[in-house]
Amino acid sequence: MSSPGNSGVAIDSTVLKAIELGTRLFKSGEYLQAKRIFTNALRVCDSYSQEQIMRIRNAYQLDTARPDNKRLYHPRYIKILDNICACYEKLNDLKSCLDVSQRLLKLEPGNIKCYIRCTRTLIKLKDWKRAYKTCSRGLQLCNNDSNHLRQQKQFIKNNMVQKQDGKRSYIDPLEETKIAKKKKNNNVLESLPKKKIKGSTKKTDLVGNLPIEILPIIFQRFTTKELVTLSLVCNKWRDKILYHLDCFQEFNLAPINFKNFVKFMDFLQQNFTRTYRKYILSQVKVSSRITSEELRITQLLFSKMPKCINIERLILSMPTLTTTQIFKLMVRGGTDFFTRLLELSLMITYRPDKQHELEILQTCPLLKKIELIFVNSLVPIFDGNNSVGRDGSFNVMARHTNMQISTADNDEQGIVEEKVIYSELEKITLICDKKKIKNFPLCRALLRGQFPLLQKLTITGVTFPMNNQDIMNFQWLLNFPDLKELWIEDNDNCELSKFLQLLKFSNVWKNLEKLTFRENKLYPIVNLDEDQPVTNDDEVPSMLFYKENLQNLEKLDLMGTSISGSALTRLCEQEYLDGRKLRSLNIGNCPNIQFPNNHAHTARMILDVNAVLKRLSKLEEINLSHLSSLNDSTMKSFIINVPFLENLKRLDISHNFEITGISIYEFLKKFQMDHDNEAGGQPLAYLNIDGCSQVSHITVNMIRAQNLVTQVDCVYERDVWRKFGINSYSYS
C-alpha cells in the first residue's frame, strides 16, 4: 500500500501513532492498556466528518464513492476493531469480543479473518450451533479454501457429537447434500465420527496394562516415598506396586511416633511375609518424634521385624537410650535381625562403666561399618553423682575409663582369653559430645588390635587418658597397617607432636591415602628440625619413617594444629610428601604458619611457599582459611608461584579479614593467563571467600563477569567454617 499524501497526514497522524503505540503495548502483554489506546483511536475515527474521511481515503488512494449515500469509514477502522477484538480475547472478555467480531462481519462480510475470530470466540463460549453456522458461511465465501476454518469446523462437529447424548443434532442441508452425493457416487459408507472419537479419546493405564515383567524397570526409578504415593491412586496400582516389593529399597522414618511406627511394622508383616522368599532393604532410618517413645519403638523394631527381611544399613537415632539398653534389646529381639547387617549407625547415650558397645559389635558378625555418635553420658547412681555435665560427673567418668585401662594392662592373660577379633569391620566412626563425655569409647579394643581389616577410622570428641602412654603416644595405631583413611579431630590430650613422633620412628601404614588431624587447642609449636635425632648422617635416613608413612597421601588436613611453617616446608623439601600423589592440602587456622614478607626465610614459623608449591605441583585443592598472616603483601608469594598451580581447581581463603579484592583479582588474573588453552584462559573452578569483609561486592561481580572463576562463594556474615558431617565431625 502506498503511503498517504501530505493532505491526509496531518489529520491521520494521531490515529497512526495510537495504532503503533497500542500494537507495542499488545506485544508486551499490556492488553488492558492496549485496548484503551485502540478504543480512543476508534473514537477519533468516529469523530471525523465524511469530508475528512474522504480526504484521508484519497491520500491512501482508496475508493471514495458513496452509493446510496452510505457512510465511509477510516482506512484503519477495520484494523482497529480487529485489534480491540484481539485485546478482549486476551483479557478473556468473550462477550465483548463476540460483539466486536459480529460488528466486523457486518462492516466487512468478505473478511475471512473476521469469520475465524468470531468462530473461535463462539467455540470458547461453547455455543456450538452459532459457531457451526458462522464457520460454514465463512467456508462458502472462500470456496472451502481456509485451513483454519476447516479445522474449526471439524472440531465443532466432534464436540457436537459428544454432546448429543440421544438429543436431536443440528443438520446442515449443504453438508447433507454433499454426503449423499458421495455415498451415491462411491458407494462407500463412511465411518461414523462417534467411533473415531471413542478410539481417539481412549485412555491408557500404563501401570495397569503394562506387562508385569516391565514394571520393575519403571518402579526402580522411584523412591520409596514416591511408590507409596503412587499406590494410593487406585487398588489396581496398589496391587501392582506391592507385587514388586524388591523396588522398596529404603525407608526413612525420621521422625516418627509410635502409632505410625506400628502401622509401618504391620505393613512389613502383611506384605513381605506373603511369600517364602528373602527381601533385602538397603537402608532403614528410624528416629522417634517423642523422646518417651524411643524405647518402645526400638523394642518393636528389634523384636517384630519379619525374618524374611535382611537390612544392610540401619540408622537409629535414639539419644536417650544407652548402650546397655540397646544391647539388651538386641539380645532379647534375637540375632536374626543382626546376622546380615552390614552397616550400623547409632546416636545414643554412652555408659562409661560398661563396655556394651563392644557387645553390640559382637551381635553383628558381618558388620563392615559402625558409626557411634554419643550425645550424652550416663553414670551409675552408686557413684554419688549421675548428672551429666558437672565436674563431679566428669571425674567419675574419667575414673571408670582409667580403671578399665589399668585393669586391661595388669591382666594380659585375661585379655588374651577374652579378646574377640572383628574380622569383617572396615570402617569405624566414633563421634562424642566432649562437653558431656570425658572418656575414650572403644579404647580397649583399639589397644588390643581387635579390628585387623580396619581401613577407615574417625575419632572425634574423645578424651585421651593421661595415665596410659600407649594411647597418648598413638601406639595403638600400629595395630592397623592397612588403614587408608584416618580422621582425628577435636580430642582432648591429643597432640600432633606425639603423633609425628610415632610416624618418625615407626613404619605404621602401608598405604594411607587420607589423613586429617585437627587439635582442639594450641599446643607447643611443632618443628621437625628440633625433633631430629643427633646421629651420623648415614644413620638418619634409616631411622626416619616419615616418607614410608606419608608417601601415598592424596589428602592432608592439618587444620587448627600447632605445626610450624618450617615443619611443613621440611615435609615437602625432604620429599616425605609425594607431590605426584597429593591432591588436597588444608592448613587453615594454623597460627604457627606465617608467610614471608621478604626473601629471608629464617624464622621457624615461615612457610616457604615456593618450595612447597614447587614440590606439590599436582595439588587440586588448597585451604588457607583463618590464616592471620594472609594479606595483600603475603599473597604476592602465591601470585609469583602461580605457574606451579597448574592443576588447582578449588581454593578456600575464607575468613581472612585483612585480604582485599585487589590481591585476589591479581591472583585469579595471573592464574587464568598462565593456564591458557585453545578456548582461552582457564578459570579457577571454585573460590571461597566467605567472611572476607575487606573484599568488595564490586570486585566479586567483576570476577564473575570476567569469568575468572566458575563458582564463587561469598557470604560476608558467615562466621563459622565448620559444617558437621560435611567438612567436620566435631559434634559441638
UniProtKB/Swiss-Prot annotation:
The lineage of its organism: Eukaryota, Fungi, Dikarya, Ascomycota, Saccharomycotina. LRR repeats lie at residues 425-449, 480-505, 509-532, 550-574, 579-602, 616-637, 645-669. The keyword Signal does not apply. Belongs to the DIA2 family. F-box protein component of a SCF (SKP1-CUL1-F-box protein) E3 ubiquitin-protein ligase complex which mediates the ubiquitination and subsequent proteasomal degradation of target proteins. Probably recognizes and binds to phosphorylated target proteins. The SCF(DIA2) complex is specifically involved in the pheromone induced degradation of phosphorylated TEC1. The SCF(DIA2) complex binds to DNA replication origins. It comes from the Eukaryota. Signal peptide: none annotated. It comes from Saccharomyces cerevisiae (strain ATCC 204508 / S288c) (Baker's yeast). This is Protein DIA2.
